[in-house]
Amino acid sequence: MIELKTPREIEEMKPAGRFVGGILKELQETTKVGTNLLEIDEFVHKKIVDRKGAESCYVDYAPDFGTGPFAHYICTSVNDAVLHGVPYDYSLKDGDLVSLDLAISVDGWVADSAVSFVVGKDPDPEDLRIIKCTEEALAAAIDVAKPGNRLGDISNTIGDVAREYGYPINLEFGGHGVGHIMHGDPHVPNDGRAHQATSCAKAGHRHRTVVPQDHRRDLPGSEGRLDPACLRRLARRPLRAHHRHHRERPDRLHRSHQPLIGVWRMVGA
């Protein structure tokens, strides 16, 4: 069931959005060649411990698409890892494409977001191109994420941008509602038919829009495999691959007119 939010509840959700957005912004600015994925995980752990009312949404989380409880505070997906990467003893190298995915509850309200970037001074142009694709898909979907439009309009907009770039679309994962829980209704696919959906976007509905789980770099025949825990990789590894990006403004709060950005990262609302 879709969890609609009152104006008061929307205000109560903002601290979680600011907290998650601030952590991801700081990590994007400080992560560099030589940074170990376990250092990133410990950084987030300390941030949560130091924040009153904050709890990790990941620790002990056991989704049906995984092989056991998650034991870390952030997902770190590098290069060909699609999403849900588990932090391990790996130091980042020049040119690594990194996706950091973070969900935290603050005073009972969840914020869930991710950011992707290339480490070092020698980025692969294709990595930069796929990041640009996801940024544009996010911005385009935000424009149609408003009351009266259907979820199919959002999904179709995402798919259209991916097709313009020539990327196949992975529909295995997608966006989702957030509120008191991390994974709520509705599911928002990365592609769909315009004007088609089981329900319309409504005022007070909050969800991670667009490239919420953007698996843009799947190649034909690379249906994917599941590594230990929740990590999703491609069955055949192309060059570098990036498949999830929520950049800067992934959470949306539907009001009566325009959506409201719910995770503050680059924009310091």
What residues fall within each predicted segment?
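Active-site neighborhoods and metal-handling regions in enzymes and metal-associated proteins
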Residues: 1-269
